[in-house]
């Protein structure tokens, strides 16, 4: 049995696509994040996983990959992703927990995780899992919300917020919503055996007045010009990091899925489920989605 359960932010049943993205005035943020991800992402590869893929907003950027795994904690988000994505044959849809990922060691060439880190209670534990499933020298592109952006600094100096943006410790400003100091995040990556290669600061112009008065593509174009400054300083609300997994090669992966509870690789298909031969748990596989969130049956 692996470690105790950790609180997870669950978007099950939410209208995330419509209530947060589409028609909600975040076209600029979407464009800016796409620019950052495209600049950091290797152009092609065999197997990529996106952790916290939601409804598949960024999946079109993975066209150069033979197989793409879209993982989310909310099954309803992946059901929406199936409808949202036209060439779904390239995609593998998996419900899972970032703290207990249902994949064998060293499986993925590339890993992406955008707008997920800010929901994580235990960043070191999550990074340990990401390190486990990526191959030696594989690439991880990780986004995190930053506490040390210009707006928070100004608020703190004007005494309009209590927390210090220069304090390295994470701040939970709403339940299960965290901002991180870029230096603290770099330290966590290093301790998890990731070597930071590139950093891009993103969403320089996330200011209501600018967003209201200027076209999103103008703001995104200016953001693209400013993003490389993240190599030297990070004063934006969003930071993208490209890091390499620094670990010794253990040879080719021993399969694909593993039981997220006992980590056995011996999973046998039976009807619309996979049965773990070690612990006896049954994992749902119907509807084109592998569901490793809650077992159908437990020993």
Regions found by a protein language model. Name each.
Residues 115-119:
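Short catalytic micro-motifs in class I SAM-dependent methyltransferases
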Residues 159-162, 187, 198-271:
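A C-terminal cap/extension of S-adenosyl-L-methionine-dependent methyltransferases
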Residues 112:
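A conserved beta-strand element that flanks and buttresses the S-adenosyl-L-methionine
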